[in-house]
Amino acid sequence: MNSAEQTVTWLITLGVLESPKKTISDPEGFLQASLKDGVVLCRLLERLLPGTIEKVYPEPRSESECLSNIREFLRGCGASLRLELLFPPSQPPQHLVTTILLSASTFDANDLYQGQNFNKVLSSLVTLNKVTADIGLGSDSVCARPSSHRIKSFDSLGSQSLHTRTSKLFQGQYRSLDMTDNSNNQLVVRAKFNFQQTNEDELSFSKGDVIHVTRVEEGGWWEGTLNGRTGWFPSNYVREVKASEKPVSPKSGTLKSPPKGFDTTAINKSYYNVVLQNILETENEYSKELQTVLSTYLRPLQTSEKLSSANISYLMGNLEEICSFQQMLVQSLEECTKLPEAQQRVGGCFLNLMPQMKTLYLTYCANHPSAVNVLTEHSEELGEFMETKGASSPGILVLTTGLSKPFMRLDKYPTLLKELERHMEDYHTDRQDIQKSMAAFKNLSAQCQEVRKRKELELQILTEAIRNWEGDDIKTLGNVTYMSQVLIQCAGSEEKNERYLLLFPNVLLMLSASPRMSGFIYQGKLPTTGMTITKLEDSENHRNAFEISGSMIERILVSCNNQQDLQEWVEHLQKQTKVTSVGNPTIKPHSVPSHTLPSHPVTPSSKHADSKPAPLTPAYHTLPHPSHHGTPHTTINWGPLEPPKTPKPWSLSCLRPAPPLRPSAALCYKEDLSKSPKTMKKLLPKRKPERKPSDEEFASRKSTAALEEDAQILKVIEAYCTSAKTRQTLNSTWQGTDLMHNHVLADDDQPSLDSLGRRSSLSRLEPSDLSEDSDYDSIWTAHSYRMGSTSRKSCCSYISHQN
């Protein structure tokens, strides 16, 4: 490898330069672009000698900030890389003190920023690499990547014993040292964490495994043997086994082992402090960001009257309480870091505040979907307001990001605590609390995500139109107490259907999703009065289930997604049924009709012509939907989200005209189309089982039609002989009679008239045809006109015959 490739590898190994996602064709160009802003250089010097960098711009946005970072690196090199290397007393006196100085005048800051004389920059880094390799700096770990923010120096690094520093000096002398079985004092280490190999030459192990080190290399990777397998592993994942713990080997050898002072304990302590300081700094930064969002944007917006008070409350949520809580948390962590390391209880601090934190963040996440809805509806006004307050364009994005910070911060806690645990001593008093805190934060983060998803779905249901909705608007039911997606199984049926249950103060609403998940379909409502909730034990047929029963409700089995969802439903329903039983004891069953099947009742608003009708179920107070054969089902058959469209079989019976419609039914239908179709259904005659017509029946029906036609003609003649007033009255009577008997007259008319007569039967009309008044009226108007023409022809022929 050339010098540029070696330098890139060195920086990536130290963790100060991110590894590129693809192969680098020009290492020197990649290195020049990476070093231009000076951030990587400052990270490098801080990695080698923590506390050296005093001021750094993590994300420089101007030329001056980039040059400031580069000059800070050069200043740190000139001030700090004068290292006194003290050798053990056994060494010759002339080697007691050696001074190595890296000149800071090797390259100029402007040269690096402008891309000039990059060879000088590269030469300086190569020299720095060689110097630090000789004295053993920066080779302790490659797994822990420091924060991009400034990391302060700690006393634990400055107070390392002379013996430890001497051991680091000799670490370079023992690199590439092959330790064979003849080694007398072979280095033995014990795994502190689990490690899974990602390459073939790496060694996998579990926590607690004892590994025999066969080679110590710079860069943080050692070679060792475990259970007959040899491979490379990260050195900061293990700790050296003390002399009292080492197994006695009967074999002897001549090769030396590394100095006894070479231990990772001091390194882990230093990184523990680094991680803890990082937690404190990021926590303080997060608290300041919340204060900025409140003081700069939300509080002025509250007094500007640009939005209603309700929308302002949605945007604010409980952000004020969270901000106050985070300030208190920062103070608690600062007090904790002032204690000696052995007495620091960071995990205990988080555990003590977890109940309060859980309440605050769950409340915030439940309100967040409503806040997003306000942001969407008033994006223009809010964007303009934010920009007037100094926010960068687009201003709405600044507010959206600010309102998302609480749950974004919540997701980071498990990772931060995991890193703290990695660099903690095995027998630290706070280790168990750290582990409990990690589990608590993971659980809280999952709950917050679930609450957000549920509230987003709830908001969608309350704001969008629901297909086949019956009764008053959904907003009149009150606030949603609880909702989730469940599986519903009715008594006597083995089929389970996905449903969305929404619990309101007095009603349990049941919805299903459309096949394309584009909306929701109304399935029914159950009154909470008289409802009995029974929690069921898990079995082979159901898990996390409860049962709904009652005097007016047929037994329903509800299966929840998890145990937490089950507990929430049982508690809310039991509490709700007690409240409604005391406060609202009399609720009429028919006031909350329930459709247990995805039925499409014959109402003017229904648009599902080919849907399968629902059966009659008095226990749920469903509408009397007839089956295909005219007989109601006796058992409930739960269908899918939407019933499939199945074509009806055709037979000769389809040519048979339907029974005539009673005029009272038509008048009732025209009177009020918005009411429930129960009244109209009662007026319709029940269909008898269909059978093929015989010749005798056809002749009888034809003769009856002829007699009725003669009666009509006589009435017409009588009307012509009376006064104008009487003729007008009889004309109305004739039209009503014609309306009532048009199906019979249609049998002797032409085929097209017979086809139109079949369409006139209300019992055979599809629901979509009944949805429009104009279509319904046009059918009867056409019949009256055609029947009137036929009767007038018959009348003329009769008069001519009499004459």
UniProtKB/Swiss-Prot annotation:
Name-wise, this protein is: Rho guanine nucleotide exchange factor 7
Post-translational modification, as annotated: Phosphorylated by PTK2/FAK1; this promotes interaction with RAC1. Phosphorylated on Ser-694 by CaMK1; enhancement of GEF activity and downstream activation of RAC1.
The annotated regions of Low complexity compositional bias extend over 752-765
Q: So what does this one do?
A: Acts as a RAC1 guanine nucleotide exchange factor (GEF) and can induce membrane ruffling. Functions in cell migration, attachment and cell spreading. Promotes targeting of RAC1 to focal adhesions. May function as a positive regulator of apoptosis. Downstream of NMDA receptors and CaMKK-CaMK1 signaling cascade, promotes the formation of spines and synapses in hippocampal neurons.
The chain positions of domain PH read 473-578
Give the UniProt record's GO annotations in the biological process aspect: ephrin receptor signaling pathway; focal adhesion assembly; Golgi organization; lamellipodium assembly; negative regulation of microtubule nucleation; nervous system development; positive regulation of apoptotic process; positive regulation of fibroblast migration
Q: Which residues form the DH domain?
A: 271-451
Compositionally skewed regions (Basic and acidic residues) per UniProt: 691-700
Q: Where is the Calponin-homology (CH) domain?
A: 1-133
